[in-house]
């Protein structure tokens, strides 16, 4: 399934049905009076977060969503049928933005959460409403209220517990593949990952979700490389895992590049809890590994961990560190299977 995290939609709620001008006409009733019914209410446009979706690709092929109009009123005080609502089903974590792409209308973060995007127009009054002591036979009714037209943007921000950070080829996808059932594309060239990937990672009978985003480069906040569009997918993460390529000759510059892009993006991303890890230690000898760890500890203030996503060295320690940083609320505890004792 193709990944799409930003799309534009056009919506219109249904117009209300017009009121009816009608008079009671029955045998032996000479002056029946007005009996025109009201028009039906137009359909509304809703958005609902549903489970099982992780992309907005469906909205690439259909961008226009129009609710049904209400039916006009009828004689014998019959109200017209209401127009059918239309529901936009979106993934959990979808933000709905106004046409300016800045004003947030709603953030759908829970399954089943709904929001009304455009309310249907009210139906018009039939002539029964205009009867008075001075006007016993009104020939007047109201038209239905027009529907509402809007242009909106949908932006998907994946919901994960841990977000992976790093320059291209830092080993983020390798780490995700080694610790979960996710199978992102892995190759020895930059920007192998072109869209975010999610994986469920388990350690010590608990599970949490890890998000892998495309690598950042200097100037990403200005649109270089793949830009910073994908940083929105780690806004909701409880902790960030910053991976460094241990074979890089410019570790300090690499650190400042990523931190600079986080600060340029804003929304407090640079202030999130962050675990720094030196990756690919299987490709380093003892002396070079010690030197790289010393450099990173000096610039980060200590606490740098080391691992190899390919060989698996230190991966469990990193997962346990991540688990400790995540609050207990989002952690999913796996049931421990108790085996019955063997009986002859």
UniProtKB/Swiss-Prot annotation:
One record GO biological process: ribosome biogenesis
InterPro entries reported for this sequence: G_OBG (IPR031167), GTP-bd (IPR006073), GTP-bd_Obg/CgtA (IPR014100), GTP1-OBG_CS (IPR006074), GTP1_OBG_dom (IPR006169), GTP1_OBG_dom_sf (IPR036726), OBG_GTPase (IPR045086), P-loop_NTPase (IPR027417)
Pfam families: GTP1_OBG, MMR_HSR1
Keywords of the record: Cytoplasm, GTP-binding, Hydrolase, Magnesium, Metal-binding, Nucleotide-binding
Residue pairs linked by disulfide bridges in the UniProt entry: none
Signal peptide positions (record): none
Record flagged with keyword Transit peptide: no
Cellular-component GO terms for this entry: cytoplasm
Binding-site positions, GTP: 166-173, 191-195, 212-215, 279-282, 308-310
Enzyme class: hydrolase
EC number: 3.6.5.-
Main location group: cytoplasm
Ranges annotated as biased composition (Polar residues): 130-144
Family indicated by similarity: Belongs to the TRAFAC class OBG-HflX-like GTPase superfamily. OBG GTPase family.
Subunit-structure text: Monomer.
Full protein name: GTPase Obg
Source species of the chain: Roseobacter denitrificans (strain ATCC 33942 / OCh 114)
């Amino acid at each position: 399934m193709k990944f799409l995290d930003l799309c534009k939609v056009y919506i219109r709620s249904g117009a209300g049905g017009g009121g009816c001008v009608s008079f009671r006409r029955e045998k032996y009733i000479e002056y029946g009076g007005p009996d025109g019914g009201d028009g039906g209410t137009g359909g509304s446009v809703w958005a609902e977060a549903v489970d099982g979706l992780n992309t907005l690709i469906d909205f690439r092929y259909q961008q226009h969503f129009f609710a049904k109009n209400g039916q006009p009123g009828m004689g014998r005080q019959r109200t017209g049928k209401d127009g059918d609502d239309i529901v936009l089903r979106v993934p959990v974590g979808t933000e709905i933005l106004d046409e300016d792409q800045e004003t947030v209308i709603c953030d759908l973060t829970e399954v089943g959460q709904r929001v009304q995007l455009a309310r249907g127009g009210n139906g018009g009054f039939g002539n029964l409403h205009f009867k008075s002591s001075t006007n016993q036979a009104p020939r007047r009714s109201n038209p239905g209220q027009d529907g509402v037209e809007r242009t909106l943007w949908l932006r998907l921000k994946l919901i994960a517990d841990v977000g992976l950070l790093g320059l291209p080829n830092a080993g983020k996808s390798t780490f995700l593949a080694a610790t979960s059932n996710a199978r992102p594309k892995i190759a020895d060239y930059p920007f192998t990952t072109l869209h975010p990937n999610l994986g469920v990672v388990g350690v010590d009978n608990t599970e949490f979700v890890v998000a892998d985003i495309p690598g950042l480069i200097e100037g990403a906040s200005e649109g270089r490389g793949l830009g910073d569009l994908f940083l929105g997918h780690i806004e909701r993460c409880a902790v960030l895992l910053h991976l460094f390529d241990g074979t890089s000759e410019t570790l300090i510059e690499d650190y400042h590049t990523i931190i600079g892009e986080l600060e340029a993006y804003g929304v407090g991303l640079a202030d999130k809890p962050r675990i720094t890890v030196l990756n690919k230690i299987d490709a380093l000898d003892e002396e070079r590994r010690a030197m790289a760890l010393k450099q990173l500890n000096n610039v980060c203030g200590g606490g740098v961990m080391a691992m190899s996503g390919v060989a698996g060295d230190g991966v469990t320690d990193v997962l346990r560190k991540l688990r400790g940083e995540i609050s207990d609320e989002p952690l999913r505890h796996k049931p421990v299977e108790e085996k019955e004792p063997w009986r002859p």
